[in-house]
Amino acid sequence: MSKRTFQPNNRRRAKTHGFRLRMRTRAGRAILATRRSKGRARLSA
């Protein structure tokens, strides 16, 4: 039997999808801008 692929880990989650990571690149900032304009309650992890 294969293991479950999702092994929750908050630190890894933030490091991969976090706000500061999004702010680091131009593309990431574009993602945030899109989510802001859409009115998302959560911008990032």
UniProtKB/Swiss-Prot annotation:
Claim: Ribosomal protein is one of the keywords in the record: yes
InterPro entries: Ribosomal_bL34 (IPR000271), Ribosomal_bL34_CS (IPR020939)
GO cellular component: ribonucleoprotein complex; ribosome
A Pfam family that the UniProt record links to this protein: Ribosomal_L34
Molecular function terms, GO-annotated: structural constituent of ribosome
UniProt key word Ribosomal protein: yes
Domain of life: Bacteria
A single GO BP: translation
UniProt keyword terms in alphabetical order: Ribonucleoprotein, Ribosomal protein
Family: Belongs to the bacterial ribosomal protein bL34 family.
UniProt xrefs under NCBIfam families: rpmH_bact
Name under which the protein is recorded: Large ribosomal subunit protein bL34
The organism of origin for this protein: Streptomyces coelicolor (strain ATCC BAA-471 / A3(2) / M145)
